[in-house]
Amino acid sequence: MEYILLLVGFILLIKGADFFVEGSSSLAGILKVPSVIIGLTIVAMGTSAPEASVSINAALAGSNDIAISNVVGSNIFNGLVVVGICAFLHSFMPHGEILKRDMPLNILVTVVLCLMFLDGSLSRIEGAVLLFCMIAYLGFMIYSARKNREEGEPGKILSLPRSLLYIAGGLAAVIFGGDLVVDKACIIATNFGVSQNFIGLTIIAIGTSLPELVTSIVATKKGDSGLALGNAIGSNLFNILFILGMSAVISPLHVLGESVIDTVLLLGSAILLFVFARTGRRMTRSEGAACVLLYVAYTAYLFVR
């Protein structure tokens, strides 16, 4: 029964995030909010809503291992699998701003997280620092985007009542689904005698990263593979700065030694992705395949450690 409810939780997370994004984007169109701002805020937060719901629910429940490992595992999955699969399907040239600004920032943020983890905890003050950095980053992105704004085609606009219904229903599904996933994953971990850290790094991390994976594959099939890298990097920054920051502010997180090791491995994957993107300023199919194989090796390492 736990497995069925876990699956139901994942479905609620993914579909809830989809409805939340669609309703929010439609409301923005009704209110004439620039689409670029929606892309940087609502859509980014919507696709990471499953991770946010799981980690924040885990922090409230005192399941620190899941709160941390969900974010670290999701970020490793985004960097290696999401980008890797898209590059394997179709090699692409990363956008200049991502190479010059966002990828180095992603590495820097991961380094800071490693340093914060060294004392074995993520305090409320450290969480507040991460949240402040997220606000500053969003503020800069919005300022930069509005300064150099290029208006695109308006997206699908629903009626106002339907938009509000999508937002409320989607948010409720994400919150309830996140609570269900955390609860059932903890029970399954206990039954099998495996750690919450392992469950968070694998099953939960992959499940909550499905919106990013699906979005990126669809973009690749439409010939816009370069968006895959932007989606992965943007989601990873949001996961660390907002989700871990908010989780720590709600309840200070105890960090296991294994989590420090996993975060160092996350840093390694971020650096590797940057190197691949810089070489020839193109992510090739062979580099994409290498990323996916590295994730398979990492998963095998989790099984045996």
Show which residues each predicted segment covers.
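Hydrophobic alpha-helical segments, chiefly the membrane-spanning helices
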Residues: 1-305
